[in-house]
Amino acid sequence: MTDNIAATIKEKRERLHMTQKEFADALGLSKYGDRTIRRWERGETKPTGAELKAVIDFPDTPPYPNNENGRYRMIDLFAGIGGTRLGFHQTNAVNVVFSSEWDKFAQKTYHANYGDFPDGDITKIDEKDIPDHEILVGGFPCVAFSQAGLKKGFNDTRGTLFFDIARIIKEKKPHAFLLENVKNLLGHDKGRTFSIIKNTLEELNYTVYYNIFAAKDFGVPQNRERIYIVGFNKEKVRNHEHFTFPTPLKTKTRVGDILEKSVDNKYTLSDALWNGHQRRKLVNAAAGKGFGYGLFNENSPYTNTISARYYKDGSEILIEQKGSNPRKITPREASRLQGFPSDFIIPVSDTQAYKQFGNSVAVPVINAIAEKIISTLDS
């Protein structure tokens, strides 16, 4: 019987293309869970009934397969783990015909949830080889343009990742696009960066709309502000002036709504780490700097922004625990902060999961904007 259980566990893990560490974290095992998995697979120990059930029940089919009957073809650039795709998927209106993401761990999460394996580095993909599509979505790093202040147009964007978005738009001429970026893009390089982006898109015959939204105003308890840039092709979408951004719901949010009922001790800060956080906060306060840890409880309305560096020490979002040091949020809680559904599969280690959700988007904001874009295209 032990041999059968060992074989079942190993076969399941390998079929999911997960390491022992990834599988242990995905199953919610304790700090040295990879050792536990190793012992199970060797038949040295047996999982409890609940642990074996967790292994068997772990999903091995994507919860969000592509809707090939979607009326609008879409491509997903700088896709990450597909948060933007998910927001559009929820409209039931799109068929994703191409995706691109270079990070191998993000590719793994993307594949587990959508069944598609994204193409790699977009800078190495010829725009002519990308399938025709009506909608383009993507985010891109906020960088200064080397020739800022000159022509302020398409040619000034060469050598940046935005250029890859622009060259694809120029070649494929989608009906609409949605780009997401940090709020500071507006003021970056004294406004020159955004000016070049907007002028480039307008030069390509698009009417450009933009707005800043906070995730907390769309039902998730996170103070995450981002700029959303929407464009419509003037020739293909003649009623683009009917487009309006969604009105934020601004319903009250509560951190307790995303917290798990039972959390492993591995997420609790050690005395050394907690003392270090407190010491640095005092030093920064004395120096007039605002940086320090962020401490929240179940009644807090929202948290700070979760970032890709959260895996390092978790300082931006710590959860109070009575009679104990604070703890980091779990990867599942991080996913909920971004509005991902509970059945979203996390097939990577905790470290990678924190990076992925920190780099991702607030899905409810994307979905609200997606509905408006689809409505404009439909009309």
UniProtKB/Swiss-Prot annotation:
Its EC number is 2.1.1.37. Residues 9-66 form the HTH cro/C1-type domain. PROSITE patterns: C5_MTASE_1, C5_MTASE_2, HTH_CROC1, SAM_MT_C5. It catalyses: a 2'-deoxycytidine in DNA + S-adenosyl-L-methionine = a 5-methyl-2'-deoxycytidine in DNA + S-adenosyl-L-homocysteine + H(+). It is an enzyme of class 2 (transferase). Residues 72-379 form the SAM-dependent MTase C5-type domain. The keyword Amino-acid biosynthesis does not apply. The active site is at C142. This is Type II methyltransferase M.SsoII. It comes from Shigella sonnei. The gene is ssoIIM.
